[in-house]
From Swiss-Prot:
Gene3D superfamilies to which the protein is assigned, alphabetical: Bira Bifunctional Protein, Domain 2, Nucleic acid-binding proteins
One annotated Gene Ontology cellular component of this protein: cytosol
The protein, known as: Lysylphosphatidylglycerol biosynthesis bifunctional protein LysX
Source organism: Mycobacteroides abscessus (strain ATCC 19977 / DSM 44196 / CCUG 20993 / CIP 104536 / JCM 13569 / NCTC 13031 / TMC 1543 / L948) (Mycobacterium abscessus)
Gene transcribed to yield this protein: lysX
A Pfam family hit: tRNA_anti-codon
UniProt KW Transmembrane keyword: yes
Domain of life the protein comes from: Bacteria
Residue sites binding Mg(2+) 2 per the record: 1029
């Protein structure tokens, strides 16, 4: 958060989350580096004591094992470690000690050390008293273990609950006392032979002394079953004390007002991505912030698992620091780190810090723009909505802040009344509070019956600034079927009016199991797993949740669980069940509506800003500033000049006022003429007393002359090359006779912040010229000539047709059917109609509709799009001229097309010439005047092959010709396609001066009329010049029956996978059935005509050709 970033980053006092953290500039590590040679010791003692606990347990429940292990058990119990006969309680205590040792609990180290020291003392005493060398064996073992514990002392760093030792001692004393008193009372009732004076001491010995005194020390014996019961009393007291002593530190601290305020600030600034981010404000969670306060993770601790919900919140660049701080806290307290409900991006961040990720399920996301209940796949929802409407339901949608106090109370009452169960469930995907003043942006959707009473509600929390995430769903048992569907549909229908573009519904665990497990071919393991979940759904409604969401056809977004050790997954599962409220423990801290935190986790430097609110509301955020960019030194200098000018009150980007002259007009004006000109400075020469500058506008370039000392000083201090300048003065000449503007005043009208390329060399890299066309135009006269020539050519094409009485029209670019040419289209989608559309490959079919309507001369000059290759003559979007004339044919259009191109060449060059590279590589004019030849395509192919080819030549012969000419072909092609391939490879590429190739096979001309005299041919020509096809023309096919047959054949090719084949356009065919006059049509690639006339490539002639991403 830029607005509350501290100047320094001290750790927050009294909070473990920010102690001993790496610096912000360093990459945080998931764990401290493992360099200690004693790192293995806690695991060793954990396993050692754990095995002892297992053996104790087995010998306690199995007489056979107890008999087999009698001798070693007695030896171990006497000389090494405690192994009482048949004590389940002792096995339980040992298992708790083993677990505490494994997670590095410092208190477990002390317990084991004290136990070993005590047993060592007993061994020493036994040796002194009995001189038994066996005592020395035990002493050596104890000494080795004690030494190992002392050497590894720093490895047992995990903290325990504050005051856990005192609490454990009090529990033990209280338990022993209660057990002793109860045992004494039972002995008074059932003494058997035990004398009254020994009854209290017997009870104390059995309960608290674990039978240290022998029964021979007492007068008489109690009943046998009481002895077992008294031992159980002592064992229970010991177990309770051990649980208190060794159980994991639990995070009793929850959010404070400052914590929540900073979390809300992070959500306000960075909370656009995670739909679960707002649930971080749940007040029964604790929080750990990154040291700089720009990111945080929220968590709860259950059964020793530190459970984080969803992704970290805040700046993604600080996520690593927050995760690292959280993992260090887990280490400090011996918690097992785990995450529930992380997104794919969040799971990746956790994985980078040493955790593993497991897909948990999917979240259902709906987008109002594309949501619709029409169509067969939404029949269930549509029927439910109609049913709810018929029952008289209506829907009311409001923000929580719009509710009155009475309405809020009633909402809370209804939510409690309609809740299914006694416990409010949720942790990672539920808020757990209603009616809080800080949640005013939450959305309430209510279903209202015909009497005006609410019968159901949805509460949704904010998801960034343009989304909502479902938090609460309630309905009365009296609400009609379809109520929930009605509310969801109405929410999505009205969402865009409320600025909502995305809605997150429920999270569905194991969604893929339900989706894939019922499909044909699902494996036995998947089917078994689905059956298990189906059974579990009787209790937890997993399947019902899936069914209730899948009917809306949502987008499923995966969510992940993250963990450190796979062996801890069962415990993590239990912790998740507890956190989500499916298992309720006594003395829980769920659903706290108020702040109960004892201390704030916010870094002190942020607290000191005073921007946070103690009630937890969103802090006062300063406007977000753009990130600082590293700029070159020359740019820094120019920015400095800009700032200096602005400080003086000079507007460096003023409102425009037209100059009195262009540069060309000023140069034509006589000396002494007053002129005001503007343009870009391309060169500055300072000779001390006089300054010369070259100024260029679109028309020409002129020299500025400044000899006034004041103007000279101001100009040199403020101006750089590339600046746009307006200069006023009189026309004159310099000493060497150069025409100049003698400057009397000037002003900057646009400060250039980057240096220009070299004026003489310009942009030498062709790719740079494409990407920075604006610079190329600014400094390169040839680039200006190209764009001017293109404009002149397009204007000439338009004017030539307009002069012949043609109408210019515009037809749709977005089309439902791609047709008019054989080419691969671009596909897009319109959300309003949930409909796929194509960018047009040609306007032909719409122009022909106009011809059917009686427009006799019509043309369109516009953009077309083809998803094909990019090279010197192809660009994915291009300018296309298509024109149609009634009562004309392809011969008519040959004459018109020749005239169009010759006129365009004259407009660009002043003569009917095109520019072609000469022998020296330089462009030279080539005359294209006169009549252009018309050559039948079969004749041209025959010349190229040296073999006779005509319309009757059969396929095998044409295939043989292709093989001999090394022309590749598809064996399934007919004769027409083979001739076309031979033409394109052998004729078109080798053509020089403009030539019309005519009479193509019918099979490659689906929209062309059959030749009037030669069967199998179509009245079509292609115009080719210097290896490039410039255009094509047809005598149009006007027979609707034949047209339908040909387009049907094309549609079969499209259905068979031919991406370039035309689809069947029924609207076009229906229009043709109303009859179109005999018509000739022509299509011309305008970009290629510009290339022909200027001698440049398509990338040079287009102002902005498509360039690869950087």
């Amino acid at each position: 958060m830029t607005s509350i970033k501290p100047a320094v980053e001290p750790p927050a006092p009294d909070h473990p989350a920010v102690t001993a953290l790496p610096g912000i500039g360093a990459r945080p590590a998931a764990r401290p580096p493992v360099t200690s040679r004693w790192r293995w010791v806690p695991a060793f003692f954990g396993w050692f004591v754990g095995i002892q606990a297992i053996l104790n347990f087995l010998s306690s429940i199995s007489p056979f094992i107890r008999m087999v292990t009698k001798l070693p058990r007695e030896f171990v119990d006497e000389y090494l470690f405690g192994w009482p006969d048949g004590s389940l309680s002792w096995a339980f205590v040992l298992s708790l000690l083993a677990a505490a040792l494994a997670v590095r609990k410092s208190i477990a180290w002390w317990v084991l050390l004290i136990d070993l020291l005590g047993r060592s003392a007993l061994n020493v005493g036994g040796f002194i008293e009995h001189r038994d060398t066996t005592e020395l064996i035990g002493l050596v073992v104890h000494g080795a273990f004690i030494l190992l514990l002392l050497l590894a002392r720093k490895e047992f760093y995990a903290k325990v609950r504050r005051g856990a030792t005192v609490k454990a001692a009090l529990v033990l004393i209280a338990g022993m006392a209660a057990g002793t008193v109860l045992a004494w009372g039972l002995l008074e009732l059932f003494p058997r032979t035990l004398v009254p004076g020994d009854r209290f001491w017997w009870a104390l010995n059995r309960v608290a002394g674990f039978s240290i005194a022998s029964h021979r020390d007492f007068d008489g014996l109690p009943p046998h079953f009481l002895n077992w019961l008294f031992g159980l009393f002592g064992a229970l007291a010991l177990i309770a004390a051990a649980i208190v002593l060794f159980r994991s530190q639990r995070a009793v601290n929850a959010l404070t007002g400052d914590d929540e305020s900073l979390i809300r600030g992070l959500l306000e600034r960075y909370g656009q991505d995670d739909s679960l981010g707002y649930f971080a404000t749940r007040r029964d969670k604790a929080v750990i912030f990154a040291p700089n306060g720009r990111a945080a993770v929220t968590y709860r601790v259950e059964v020793g698992v530190c459970l984080v919900s969803a992704d970290p919140i805040g700046d993604k660049s600080a996520w690593g620091q927050a995760i690292s701080a959280w993992l260090q806290v887990c280490d400090a307290y011996g918690w097992a780190p785990a995450v529930m409900g992380a997104s794919a991006e969040g799971a990746l961040a956790y994985r980078e810090h040493g955790l593993n990720a497991l897909e948990l399920g999917d979240e259902a996301i709906l987008y109002p723009r594309s949501f619709s209940i029409s169509g067969p796949h939404m029949a269930t929802v549509r029927q439910a909505v109609n049913r709810a409407r018929r029952s008289g339901l209506s829907v009311r949608i409001r923000r929580h802040r719009e509710l009155s106090a009475e309405e809020t109370k009633q909402i809370i009452v209804n939510a409690d009344l309609w809740r299914d169960g006694n416990t409010e469930r949720g942790f990672s995907m539920a808020l757990g509070r209603l009616g809080d003043s800080t949640d005013g942006d939450c959305l309430l959707v209510e279903a209202i019956d015909s009497t005006g009473d609410p019968v159901a509600m949805l509460s949704l929390v904010p998801w960034g600034t343009n989304g909502v995430s479902l938090e609460l769903m309630r309905r009365s048992r009296q609400s009609p079927n379809g109520t929930i569907e009605f509310m969801v549909t109405e929410l999505l229908t009205r969402a865009e009016g409320m600025g909502i573009t995305r809605v997150s519904l429920n999270f569905v665990m194991f969604r893929s199991v339900y989706a894939d497990g019922s499909r044909i071919g699902a494996g036995p393991v998947l089917r078994l797993w689905r059956s298990v979940l189906m059974f579990a759904s009787r209790f937890w409604q997993f399947e019902q949740l899936y069914r209730s969401n899948v009917k809306y056809q949502p987008e499923w977004v995966p969510r992940f669980a993250c963990y450190e050790d796979a062996r801890l997954i069962p415990r993590i599962g239990i912790a998740s069940v507890i956190a989500e409220g499916f298992l309720v423990l006594p003395f829980g801290n769920r659903d706290k509506p108020r702040h109960t935190g004892q201390y704030s986790a916010v870094p002190q430097a942020i607290v000191a800003t005073g921007l946070l609110h103690h009630d937890g509301s969103t802090p006062e955020l300063l406007p977000q500033t753009a990130p600082q960019q590293r700029v070159p030194e020359q740019v820094k200098v120019r920015l400095g000049k800009l700032a200096a000018l602005q400080e003086k009150g000079i507007d460096t980007y003023p409102v425009g006022s037209p100059p009195s002259h262009t540069v060309a007009e000023a140069l034509a004006a006589p000396d002494g003429s007053e002129v005001v000109i503007s343009g870009r400075l391309l060169r500055i020469r300072d000779y001390g007393g006089v300054l010369f500058a070259q100024l260029r506008d679109w028309s020409a370039e002129v020299q500025l002359l400044i000899d006034d000392p004041r103007l000279h000083e101001e100009f040199t201090a403020a101006v750089d090359l590339g600046d746009l300048v307006e200069a006023s003065g009189v026309m004159g000449q310099s000493n060497n006779g150069t025409r100049s503007v003698l400057v009397e005043s000037w002003r900057i009208i646009g400060k250039c912040l980057h240096p220009l390329p070299d004026k003489r060399k310009g942009l030498t890299d062709p790719e740079a010229r494409v990407r920075a066309r604006y610079l190329d135009l600014a400094i390169n006269p040839e680039a200006r000539e190209q764009i001017a020539a293109r404009s002149a050519i397009i204007t000439s094409l338009r004017n030539t047709l307009l002069a012949q009485g043609f109408l210019e029209v515009e037809t749709p670019i977005l089309q439902q059917v791609h047709g008019g040419a054989n080419a691969r289209p671009f596909l897009t989608h319109i959300n309003a109609y949930n409909l796929d559309l194509y960018l047009r490959i040609a306007p032909e079919l719409y122009l022909k509709r106009l011809c059917v309507g009686g427009v006799e001369k019509v043309f369109e000059l516009g953009r077309a799009f083809r998803n094909e290759g990019v090279d010197f003559s192809h660009n994915p979007e291009f300018t296309l001229l298509e024109a149609y004339q009634a009562h004309a044919d392809y011969v008519t259009w040959a004459q018109t097309t020749q005239r169009l191109i010759q006129n365009a060449a004259k407009a660009a060059h002043g003569a009917e010439v095109v520019m072609r590279p000469g022998a020296d590589g330089r462009l030279a004019p080539v005359d294209i005047g006169g009549e252009w030849p018309i050559v039948p395509v079969h004749e041209a192919v025959s010349r190229a092959l040296g073999e006779e080819v005509n319309a009757a030549t059969e396929v095998p012969t044409l295939q043989r010709f292709c093989q001999s000419a090394e022309v590749q072909f598809n064996p399934r092609w007919d004769a027409g396609h083979l001739v076309l391939e031979l033409y394109e490879r052998l004729v078109e590429k080798h053509t020089t001066s403009p030539t019309f190739y005519s009479d193509f096979p019918v099979s490659v001309s689906p929209l062309t009329r059959p030749h009037r005299s030669i069967a199998g041919l179509a009245e079509r020509w292609d115009l080719v010049a210097w290896g490039v096809e410039l255009g094509t023309a047809y005598t149009e096919l006007t027979d609707p029956v034949e047209q339908r047959r040909r387009l049907y054949e094309q549609s079969l090719l499209a259905a068979g996978g031919d991406a370039e084949a035309m689809e069947l356009d029924e609207d076009f065919l229906r229009a043709m059935e109303y009859a179109m006059a005999p018509t000739g049509g022509m299509g011309m690639g305008v970009d290629r005509v510009v290339m022909l006339i200027t001698g440049r490539s398509i990338r040079e002639t287009l102002p902005f050709p498509l360039a690869k991403p950087r």
